[in-house]
Amino acid sequence: MRALLCLLSLVSLPALADLDYRLEPRQVAADTWVLEGRSENFSRDNGGNIVNTGFIVSEDGVVVIDSGPSLRYGQALRQAIAGVTDKPVVQVLITHHHPDHALGNQAFADVPIAALSGTKEQLAREGDALAENLYRMVGDWMRGTQVLIPAQTLQPGVRTFGSHPLRLLAFSGHSGADLAVLDEKTGVLFAGDLLFYQRALTTPHSPGLAQWVDDLQQLQAQPWTVLV
């Protein structure tokens, strides 16, 4: 029995060591980095990392756009940010309630986390079920992950961090409550999942394609230069 337990331990250690998201920030504009997820479905291979997250390094501190699919991802995101700047994270903005965008919130429990009111309501209503489903699909990557509802409620308008005025835009076409963030200094537009590239749309929470198309037309009209 002792030999069997030792063997199981040796088998499990490499498996745990492989649970590394290996996040690599890519600079897309001044003070702005993106961490690109895979163009895949959820799997035990990718750990749910099929999301594009990002962060802006302002004079006031770092603003994070989406926290990712798990506590482990959120922790890796904080480490990646620390590799770019020694400024603290001062704000997390969640674009919508889907699990790959909001289940990393625990890693930022010491930071103000904000979302649209509809996103907060959806996370409170559906978050546990979404997390449980992701646990089934990606396994141990999700260890310790629990739903953390954003404490702050966002309204459309402009919030400024240092020299970066961020225009907060509220839509609904993808999830029923979708935040897009336009940095008016750099022209970077974080569109969340309102935009898909070479992937089928995910529509279980969409109010309808007509609304989604209208949202896309409004996004297209924004003065963006880089689209995330």
Language model regions located:
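Sec-dependent signal peptide recognition
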Residues: 1-7
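N-terminal signal peptide c-region/cleavage motif recognized by signal peptidases
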Residues: 12-14
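Metallo-beta-lactamase
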Residues: 18-28, 61-63, 69-71, 121-170, 172-228, ...
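Conserved beta-strand hairpin/beta-sheet module of binuclear metal-dependent hydrolase folds
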Residues: 27-80, 180-192
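Solvent-exposed loop/turn segments at secondary-structure junctions
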Residues: 39-42, 62, 69-72, 97-101, ...
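Solvent-exposed, acidic/flexible segments
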Residues: 45-49, 67-74, 98-101, 116, ...
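Active-site HxH/HxHxD metal-binding segment of metal-dependent hydrolases
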Residues: 72-75, 79-158
